[in-house]
Amino acid sequence: MSHLKIAIRVSQLIILNQTANLSNPYESCALLLGSKKENLYEIKEVIPMNNKDSSEVSFTIDEIELLKIYKYAESLNTSVVGIFHSHPSKPFPSETDKTFMEINPIPWLIKSTITEEMRCFIFSDSSRGKIDGIEEIDLVIVKD
């Protein structure tokens, strides 16, 4: 897989940070709508979601709400191009994340509510040189 990037606007980062802060100490989650052109995922809309788990170690998005978002994305001629969630630890995928990343091979943005750092990862079919098939991708911050 060639070097991937995900572009996010400053205003979208603010929404994700607010989502994480409001849910703390529990994990927060959001869906990222947009498009992919060649090696660039472009986020067009951030949709904060409710974490059904109300947990510090996991998140689950309600299936009915998830279906609504997929239909909404389709109506905008976009798709879900990323999943965001927060960790009350370092911003790296957990073992559970890795399992779901393989099922949903789109960018996963993870924010640490401890260090405030945000990183992005994706499951890669070509796992050579990557840990558990997970590859970090560049997060490109775009001015509004």
Regions found by a protein language model. Name each.
Residues 1-80, 88-144:
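Conserved beta-strand-loop surface patch within small alpha/beta domains used
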